[in-house]
Regions:
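Bilobed "Venus flytrap"/periplasmic-binding protein-like clamshell domains
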Residues: 1-75, 90-93, 180
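Short helix-capping segments at alpha-helix termini
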Residues: 31-36, 75-77, 143-145, 191-193
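A general structural signal for short secondary-structure boundary/capping elements
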Residues: 40-44, 57-63, 86-90, 143-149, ...
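Short linear loop/turn motifs
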Residues: 86-87, 151-159, 196-207
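Secondary-structure end/capping motifs
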Residues: 107-189
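Conserved C-terminal helix/tail region of periplasmic/extracytoplasmic solute-binding proteins
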Residues: 179-208
Length: 208
């Protein structure tokens, strides 16, 4: 029954205890007619989400579709899923993002542009050659953390091919309306120490 937010009532939600994360969860549960106070919050220290939910049927975990859900599929672990952005489009925020120092951007704009051009080239290679890109990642892992997860890496890369650019004009482009919708909500809910305001915190000026 955890295929809808209200179904989290009486269950255990594994949280990173981030104010924004918890406010988003509260929003979708209440929007679905649920009572957020009936969702038990416990600290999230899980590293293998698929195995955790297999062993703990009452657990709900915030995961990345392109990794954890694919891992669950590979390991044949049945799961209920809730896609937050489908329930509230405001929560379709950009993740991950590249962060730069304002003074650096002002003083060395050409370096920033060159860095983004090189980064774009790498992403485009991954889009055009997902299997090769996955193998490069596997071969470059000198920590051993990906050992035994080679198939997961490859299937994840196949999924991410359609996510790197998605509906954007080009790689790296940030749609102001989409950006503002989320951070206006953060401002409205007073979830950050300072308000951001419209069209702040991002730039498309350094993209080729």
């Amino acid at each position: 029954g955890m295929d809808r937010p209200k179904g989290l009532e009486g269950k255990e939600y594994l949280t990173w205890q981030s104010p924004i994360e918890l406010a988003m969860m509260k929003n979708i549960v209440e929007k679905d007619g649920g009572d957020w106070s009936k969702v038990k919050q416990i600290p999230n220290n899980v590293t293998d989400e698929a195995q955790d939910v297999k062993q703990n049927k009452k657990h709900a975990i915030w995961v990345y579709e392109g990794w954890a859900l694919i891992n669950a599929k590979i390991n044949k672990v049945p799961v209920d899923t809730i896609t937050v952005k489908d329930l509230n489009p405001t929560f379709d925020y950009y993740s991950p993002v590249l962060v730069a120092n304002n003074d650096f951007l002002k003083n060395k704009p050409e370096v920033a542009k060159a860095f983004l051009a090189a980064t774009q080239k790498g992403y485009q290679f991954a889009i055009d050659n997902p299997d090769k890109a996955a193998q490069i990642l596997i071969d470059g892992d000198d920590t051993g953390s990906l050992k035994g997860s080679e198939e997961l890496v490859k299937q994840s890369q196949q999924f991410m091919v359609n996510q790197y650019i998605s509906d954007a004009k080009k790689w790296g482009y940030i749609d102001p309306a989409r950006w503002n919708a989320f951070y206006n909500w953060v401002d409205k809910e007073k979830l950050a120490d300072k308000t951001l305001g419209d069209n702040k915190g991002f730039s498309n000026d350094y993209l080729a």
